[in-house]
Amino acid sequence: MNSKGSQNVATTCKPVTTFVQTDTNTFREIVQRLTGPTENNAAAATPEATVIKTAIQKRPTSKLHERRQCMRPKLEIVKPPLSFKPTGTTPSSKSGNTNLLTSPVGTPSSLFSNLSLIEGEPDSCTTNIEEEEKAIKERRFYLHPSPRSKPGYTEPELLTLFPLTSPNSSGKP
């Protein structure tokens, strides 16, 4: 191109993206060079010359799946040897097998191993209620009882939105 522009190309695979650094004055010229001739130049060329140029310059285009295979990192599957014998050591121990990763949380059995069942005592139930009420008061959240649970509660009176009888029918027979 010219001395002001530079181009970076990946060496491991066909370049998918071309990076060009240029100034605003030469931008149009560089874009035209990268994308091909303008429409005026293409119309001015003879049809025979374009057929010969396309036959010579035509390269096999790479298909999408071929480009993706080139860009995809290779995955390796490591199988254990045939003489694999499980031992009593945990995977986190340094037994030479450093490829295994352990969870920082641990297994579910180790999480629930410290739990124990406490049979309910009548005193523990009242202390839980007292603790709950204390926490509610500290946070200034009060659970008000429903007015329906109070003695002497009667159902609210439903007001009629629409008249039950027509005013015209009551005045005339």
From Swiss-Prot:
It comes from the Eukaryota. InterPro entries: VQ, VQ_4/11/13/19/31/33. It is found in: Nucleus. Its main location: nucleus. Disulfide bonds: none annotated. Residues 154-165 have a biased composition (Low complexity). This is VQ motif-containing protein 31. It comes from Arabidopsis thaliana.
